[in-house]
């Protein structure tokens, strides 16, 4: 789609245009980063098999980064710093964060039911920390869909998510 995305972003910047990207805490099972995350144990696990908990948010299988695991958070922050901030992005949509599986196994044995509302806060914190660690605090705008008490101090903008739901269109 963009054979030289950093070059394209630089060209846009020269024209006074900002570039926003997209991220979420799911990784496609076909993505190269998935293999690394699986090898390091950075995904929420299936309680029965201990393998990554595979689900689908759209049309393809994905695993969810276990944001209860400090090492997984550090890994994903570094991905954001390298692959988004490092190529010149000016911000992004930090999507999802609300789909913590209630039957998954979390790092440290934490209860998914108790962590359900904390997960969006952890997602917002991860994004905020990536921006701060990169030294770009006031230059970057990112926005989250999911939130809970404490999220607003971690994210510059919140959006209400997708407002079209088939139940209400009939």
Regions from the PLM with identified roles:
Residues 1-170:
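Catalytic-domain carbohydrate-binding cleft regions of carbohydrate-active enzymes
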């Amino acid at each position: 789609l963009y054979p030289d995305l950093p070059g394209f972003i630089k060209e846009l910047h020269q024209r006074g245009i900002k570039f926003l990207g997209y991220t979420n805490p799911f990784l496609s099972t076909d993505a190269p980063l998935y293999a690394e995350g699986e090898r390091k144990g950075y995904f929420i696990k299936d309680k029965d098999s201990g393998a990554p908990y595979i689900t689908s948010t759209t049309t393809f299988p994905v695993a969810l980064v276990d944001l209860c695991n400090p090492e997984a958070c550090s890994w994903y922050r570094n991905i954001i710093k390298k692959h988004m901030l490092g190529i010149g992005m000016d911000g992004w949509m930090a999507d999802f964060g609300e789909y913590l599986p209630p039957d998954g196994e979390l790092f440290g044995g934490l209860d998914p039911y108790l962590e359900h509302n904390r997960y969006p806060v952890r997602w917002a914190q991860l994004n905020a920390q990536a921006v701060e660690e990169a030294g770009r605090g006031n230059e970057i705008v990112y926005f989250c869909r999911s939130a809970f008490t404490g999220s607003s101090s971690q994210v510059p903008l919140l959006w209400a998510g997708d407002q079209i739901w088939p139940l209400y269109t009939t």
